[in-house]
Swiss-Prot record:
A gamma subtype methylase, recognizes the double-stranded sequence 5'-ATTAAT-3', methylates A-5 on both strands, and protects the DNA from cleavage by the VspI endonuclease. Its EC number is 2.1.1.72. One of its GO terms (molecular function) is site-specific DNA-methyltransferase (adenine-specific) activity. This is Type II methyltransferase M.VspI. The keyword Methyltransferase applies. GO terms for biological process: DNA restriction-modification system; methylation.
Length: 408
């Protein structure tokens, strides 16, 4: 094992992909796959943020299973035109119920396609959960899913009382849109014209209509040309939050009616990584109705999925956010998140934990910013296997955290 270099405090924002690969003893391709799936977050073309690396190392890496899979190639054979033809033929033949057609299409997408496009379709039960936080009577409200895919949010909107003529869906995948239309026609008995092929980010400036409810699952980590991403981020004033999902958030807020509801299903990083600070602060300027931890609902994707539902309305000092994690549900003052460093949404903590953190942060204190050097420790991925109690050829002596005491 070889210890990686120390980084000066001013350099800790980013770590090169090659350094991460060396530290974790995997290939650069594996690191890039982890970037695609949302575990690590790009700082530049060839580096990741130090914060996401530390979080990945501490919270995700460490199981031998993950390391065994690290260099395993993703399924990369994907004939989308052939898949399109198959789906069109099935629709024309009426051989499969539209609900089943949705499942067939989603399961036919290769892992490489999903990762490239950031496509992980919302499970039906999760889509249903979002609607539990809306008013009971939605009959006069308008609904939009700007990344509607095969239509799980759209179908649930009909079931919850939205009129079909008030439901709008956009996507760039014509096959997914055709499935959405088929499902809505099967459910409502009429074909609606509000389901359109449209690149929502490019078209958001041209959409004059505003909506009362916008629920969506935006692409996770989809790559946009840097020029397009920077242009969108600047025009939408996204601050330091330039990930695709953050840009979708600001674009959606732009077409949401005052007092309207916005619900996003997002990767775990959105709620706690520094690069999303700007979008979290934008969310905190509104009433955050609920924060929900859905665990790991996507097959083949280890990152957690979490939901945020907010109302486009200024919060008062007494506003409480419903926080759901597993079987636990409690209400937490929204102000707690405003006081957190980087406005982190640590909503899966218990009420007592949140009170302790708030108390600690309220005490006058100093930080190590500008006064310390930051270094990467040795990352084995499996300490039980690679950290030995006796000397052996090719190994070097190291200190564990527990070896360091106040006396040295």
């Amino acid at each position: 094992m070889k210890q990686s270099a120390l980084f000066e405090a001013d350099d800790v924002e980013a770590i090169s992909i090659d350094d991460v690969a060396f530290s974790l003893n995997v290939s650069s391709a594996s690191v890039r796959n982890w970037i695609k799936t949302g575990y690590l977050h790009k700082a530049t073309k060839n580096s990741v943020t130090a914060e996401s690396f530390v979080a990945f190392k501490d919270e995700i890496l460490g199981t031998e299973k993950l390391n065994q899979r690290a260099n395993k190639s993703l399924k990369d054979q994907h004939d989308h035109s052939g898949l399109e033809e198959m789906i069109h033929n099935i629709i024309r033949s009426n051989e499969v119920h539209p609900e089943g057609l949705s499942d067939i299409y989603e399961e036919s997408l290769s892992e490489s396609y999903k990762n490239k496009e950031g496509v992980f379709y919302t499970p039906k039960e999760i889509a249903a959960d979002f609607f539990d936080y809306l008013p009971k009577d939605c009959s006069e409200l308008t609904f939009c899913d700007p990344c509607c895919g095969t239509g799980n949010f759209l179908i649930e909107a009909v079931k919850r009382g939205f009129k079909p003529c008030n439901i709008y869906g956009y996507d760039i995948d014509e096959v997914a849109l055709e499935i959405s239309r088929s499902r809505l026609k099967e459910l409502c008995g009429v074909a609606e014209s509000n389901i359109e092929k449209r690149d929502f980010l490019s078209a958001s400036y041209q959409i004059e209509q505003k909506y009362d409810v916008i629920f969506t699952n935006p692409p996770w980590g989809k790559k946009l040309p840097k020029k397009d991403k920077d242009s969108l981020a600047d025009s939408l004033a996204t601050g330091n939050s330039k990930d695709t999902s953050a840009i979708f958030f600001f674009a959606s807020m732009k077409i949401l009616n005052s007092s309207g509801y916005l619900g996003f299903l997002l990767q775990d990083a959105f709620f706690n990584i520094a690069s999303y600070e700007s979008v979290r602060k934008a969310a905190l300027a509104n009433q955050i109705v609920a924060l929900i931890d859905f665990g790991k609902p996507f097959k083949g994707l280890l990152t957690k999925a979490k939901g945020i539902i907010l109302r486009k309305q200024c919060p008062d000092d007494q506003h409480a956010t419903i926080c759901v994690s597993g079987n636990t549900k409690n209400e937490v003052s929204q102000r707690v998140f405003e006081k957190n460093p980087k406005s982190i949404f640590n909503f899966t903590c218990s009420e007592l934990d949140l009170e302790v953190v708030e108390h600690i942060l309220s005490i006058p204190h100093k930080t190590l910013r500008g006064s310390a050097r930051w270094g990467l420790g040795i990352v084995t991925g499996n300490n039980k296997k690679f950290c030995l109690p006796e000397a052996r050829g090719g190994y070097i002596p190291v200190y564990k955290g527990s070896d360091i005491t106040r006396k040295g």
